[in-house]
A protein has these predicted regions:
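Short S/T/G/P-rich N-terminal loop/turn motif that feeds into the first structured element of a domain
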Residues: 1-174
Length: 174
């Protein structure tokens, strides 16, 4: 969920309050709030990355949130300090490394015509990059299930911005 935020501390406070509630504690999902930087023409300043362990957990989360007054309060507080810019539901196609340990990411929104061929080429590229020590953190490809601006996105993670930039330099992507 992408958004343009006018008051980042208020977003963090609203999220912390919701996650501390009974509803936030029992819903089967995890959330990461990402600050956006260097994102070209995209207006968003922040993105919520919400992850689920499969379709049943997604279904259970919707059921929990639909009856949760704390979630309604969270949405109201969020609406007061942000404007939505993007909503995308994506499913992992291929991931390596633990992206939750990374704090900086390069994301590439792409349109893929043949997913199987793309993933085969992607794995060949990333396997070689890992073997050469060029790719040492998280990376992957996600398929967009709901959303219409691109079919997939690929990402490269880094432990911090310096690590991410070093990885990009090693991959000769500059």
């Amino acid at each position: 969920f992408g958004m343009t935020v006018s008051n980042p501390p208020a977003v963090v406070a609203a999220m912390d309050k919701f996650m501390a509630s009974e509803c936030g504690q029992t819903a089967p999902f995890s959330v990461a709030l990402m600050g956006e930087a260097f994102n070209g023409h995209e207006p968003q300043t922040h993105t919520f990355v919400v992850t689920y362990e499969g379709a049943q957990a997604l279904n259970d989360t919707f059921a929990t949130l639909s009856t949760c007054p704390e979630y309604a309060t969270f949405l109201t507080e969020l609406a007061a300090v942000s404007v939505p810019t993007e909503q995308t539901l994506a499913k992992s196609v291929y991931e390596a490394g633990d992206w939750t340990q990374d704090t900086a990411f390069a994301v590439f929104e792409i349109n893929v015509r043949n997913e199987a061929s793309y993933i085969e080429a992607y794995k060949k590229f990333t396997d070689a990059a890992v073997a050469n020590g060029q790719l040492t953190s998280s990376f992957g490809v996600e398929r967009v299930v709901a959303g219409d601006e691109y079919t997939h996105f690929a990402f490269i993670g880094g432990t911090d911005m310096a690590n991410l930039m070093a990885t990009i330099d090693l991959l000769n992507m500059d």
